[in-house]
C-alpha cells in the first residue's frame, strides 16, 4: 500500500439499514491533502463521513486503513488515528476550553484520564495551532460559533490523528470565521501532514482550499478529481439544479439571471458594468452587454446575466465586426446605458454607443448619474 495513503475506499456503498444512499465510492485519502464532498442536501455527504468514522457500517465495498479493514481496528486504536468534528455538537457550557480540548487526549490517558506534562504541552500547542490559546480559561458557554469550531478542531488535533473528518465545518459562521477555519485546516494539512475529509456547502471556499473534490448527487459520485479537473462550465449548475442563476467557475460567484425581455443594453468594459447588470437583474430587466475581452470581469458577469453579450475571444484586439454586432443588437433594446468605461480601443466602443443614439435609442450617459442609486432611479423612469 502506498505509504502516503491514510485510508482507501473500494466500491463503498453507504446508507442506513438496508437503504443505500450513495454507492460506488472510490477514494484514496492521502497525508497532508484535503478532500471535500460537495452536493445538494440529502446527497449522502454526512453519511459518507459517518461511515469513514465507523459510526455507520458500510452497506457494500470496503474501507481500509493502513492495510486493515476499518471494522477490524479496535476502538481505542482507531481513536488515535481518526478525529471527528460533526455539526450540531453542543459543547458542555460549564467546561472550560482547556478541559474540553483535554478530552481529546482520552485515547492516551487511560481509564482515570490523568494528564502528563506531555499531554499538557500538546493541549497548549493544539490551542496555539488553531489560534485559540487566549480562550483556554473561558467557559464553552461564553464562546461564539466561530470560537467553538476552532475549539473542536483543537480537540481533534490533540488526538494526534492521521485523519480528521469534518461535517460542514463552516456552517453558521460569518465570512471571516469561515476563512479562518479553512486556513487552519490548510495549515494543519500542510504542516502536520494530517489528511482532511470534509463536507461543505461553501462552493467557492471548497474549490479554493481543497486538493480533491468529490461531487455527489442522486446516489452516485458524478465526478471526482482536482478542482481544475472537476469544476467545468455548467457542472455546479447541474449539481445543484440551479434555476435562474449560474455559477462562474473562474470567479467562484453565483450570478442571478436577468429577465427575458430586452430592456437595457450596457456598453462597458473593465469592471464598470457588472454592478449595473446586477442592479438591472434586481429590477427584473433583461440585459445586453458589449464589448469586453474574455478575461474582463464584466465578461464573466455578462455570461451569467445577459441575453446578448459580445465578448472578444480572439487572441488579438476585438475586430470591428464585433463592435458592429453589439451596436446592431443594442437597437433591439428599449434603451442604452453608458457604464463610464475607459477608452482603451481608440474610441470604437464609444462610436458603437453613439450609433445607437443616432438610430433614436435613449442613451443614459455617464454624466447623467454620479452613483448607482441615481442610475437606478433614471432607469425606473424609462
Describe each PLM feature range:
Residues 102, 117-137:
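Conserved ABC ATPase "signature" region
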Residues 113-114, 139-143, 147:
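Conserved ABC ATPase signature
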Residues 241-318, 337-339, 345-347, 362-382:
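ABC ATPase nucleotide-binding domains
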Residues 164-168:
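Catalytic Walker B motif of ABC-type/P-loop ATPase nucleotide-binding domains
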Residues 53:
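Helix-to-loop junction immediately C-terminal to a conserved catalytic motif
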Residues 160:
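Conserved catalytic motifs of ABC-family nucleotide-binding domains
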Residues 61-69, 78:
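Conserved ABC transporter NBD signature motif
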Amino acid at each position: 500500500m502506498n505509504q502516503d495513503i491514510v485510508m482507501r475506499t473500494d466500491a463503498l456503498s453507504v446508507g442506513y439499514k438496508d437503504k443505500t444512499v450513495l454507492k460506488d465510492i472510490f477514494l484514496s485519502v492521502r497525508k497532508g491533502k484535503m478532500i471535500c464532498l460537495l452536493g445538494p442536501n440529502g446527497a449522502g455527504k454526512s453519511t459518507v463521513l459517518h461511515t469513514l468514522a465507523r459510526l455507520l457500517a458500510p452497506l457494500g465495498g470496503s474501507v481500509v486503513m493502513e492495510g486493515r479493514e476499518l471494522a477490524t481496528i479496535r476502538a481505542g486504536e482507531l481513536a488515535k488515528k481518526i478525529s471527528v468534528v460533526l455539526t450540531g455538537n453542543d459543547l458542555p457550557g460549564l467546561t472550560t476550553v482547556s478541559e474540553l480540548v483535554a478530552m481529546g487526549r482520552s485515547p492516551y490517558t487511560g481509564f482515570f484520564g490523568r494528564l502528563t506534562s506531555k499531554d499538557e504541552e500538546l493541549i497548549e500547542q493544539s490551542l496555539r495551532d488553531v489560534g485559540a490559546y487566549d480562550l483556554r480559561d473561558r467557559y464553552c458557554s461564553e464562546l461564539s460559533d466561530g470560537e467553538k469550531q476552532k475549539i473542536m478542531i483543537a480537540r481533534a488535533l490533540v488526538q494526534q490523528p492521521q485523519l480528521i473528518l469534518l461535517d460542514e465545518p463552516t456552517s453558521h459562521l460569518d465570512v471571516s470565521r469561515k476563512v479562518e477555519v479553512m486556513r487552519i485546516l490548510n495549515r494543519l494539512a500542510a504542516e502536520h501532514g494530517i489528511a482532511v475529509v470534509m463536507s461543505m456547502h461553501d462552493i467557492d471556499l471548497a474549490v479554493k482550499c481543497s486538493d480533491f473534490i468529490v461531487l455527489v448527487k442522486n446516489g452516485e459520485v458524478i465526478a471526482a478529481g482536482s478542482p481544475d479537473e472537476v469544476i467545468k462550465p455548467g457542472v455546479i449548475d447541474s449539481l445543484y439544479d440551479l434555476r435562474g442563476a449560474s455559477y462562474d467557475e473562474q470567479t467562484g460567484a453565483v450570478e442571478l439571471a436577468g429577465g427575458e425581455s430586452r430592456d437595457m443594453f450596457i456598453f462597458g468594459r473593465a469592471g464598470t458594468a457588472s454592478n449595473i447588470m446586477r442592479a438591472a437583474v434586481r429590477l427584473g430587466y433583461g440585459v445586453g452587454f458589449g464589448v469586453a475581452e474574455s478575461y474582463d470581469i464584466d465578461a464573466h458577469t455578462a455570461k451569467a446575466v445577459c441575453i446578448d453579450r459580445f465578448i472578444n475571444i480572439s487572441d488579438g484586439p476585438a475586430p470591428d465586426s464585433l463592435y458592429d454586432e453589439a451596436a446592431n443588437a443594442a437597437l433591439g433594446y428599449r434603451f442604452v446605458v453608458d457604464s463610464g468605461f475607459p477608452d482603451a480601443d481608440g474610441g470604437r466602443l464609444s462610436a458603437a454607443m453613439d450609433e445607437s443614439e443616432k438610430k433614436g435609442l435613449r442613451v443614459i450617459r455617464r454624466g447623467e448619474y454620479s452613483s448607482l442609486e441615481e442610475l437606478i432611479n433614471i432607469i425606473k423612469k424609462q
